[in-house]
Amino acid sequence: MTSRTAQVSRITNETKIQISISLTGGPIERPQPSLFASEKGANTAGPDDASQTTASQTIDIHTGVGFLDHMIHALAKHAGWSLIVECIGDLHIDDHHTTEDCGIALGEAFKEALGAVRGIKRFGSGFAPLDEALSRAVVDISNRPLAVIELGLKRERIGDLSCEMIPHFLESFAEAARITLHVDCLRGFNDHHRSESAFKALAVAIREAISSNGTNDVPSTKGVLM
């Protein structure tokens, strides 16, 4: 199995994003040079980051959108990834470009780190509760990008993240990662809980889908998943 690591940089007129990822956790190198070392007057990484370092994982997320940081942190933690995300976006406009582009960049990093779709289970599913909320996620590492997201969110915003951008982040991730993704919140009345349980369920599903199936075969009747 490959090292399952990747570094991705996505630079547009709207956002600057750098990502380092290890799908198996462990030590991870921070992108160099850091965006926050070179951008004066931009969003500055600090104690409000979604950061966590343990013996098995390093996670440091700074998108400039607090609730988005929180969701990506939950995804990385429960998927078993080490993940560093740095983003400087045009938040003076709104949160759309930052959220969408972070989803795209994370999907690209995931795809690159996974490498050839060979010797993995391919399919994964997961349930995750958070108090009264319960979500289900089903993943197919298929090279057939599609996302069906039903979270049933009622609020306009959670913190500084527009609720309409939460499913859009997942759609952007699935498109760039080239996976088929179904995520549903089955019940719950607190939109924070509904969203977080969805990201945790996705983490469980991805962790299963990319786990070894004990062979070196391509898990497809076609013989290819490119």
Swiss-Prot record:
Its EC number is 4.2.1.19. GO terms for biological process: L-histidine biosynthetic process. Pfam families: IGPD. Transmembrane segments: none annotated. One of its GO terms (molecular function) is imidazoleglycerol-phosphate dehydratase activity. SUPFAM superfamilies: Ribosomal protein S5 domain 2-like. Keywords: Amino-acid biosynthesis, Histidine biosynthesis, Lyase. It is an enzyme of class 4 (lyase). Pathway: Amino-acid biosynthesis; L-histidine biosynthesis; L-histidine from 5-phospho-alpha-D-ribose 1-diphosphate: step 6/9. Belongs to the imidazoleglycerol-phosphate dehydratase family. This is Imidazoleglycerol-phosphate dehydratase. It comes from Maudiozyma humilis.
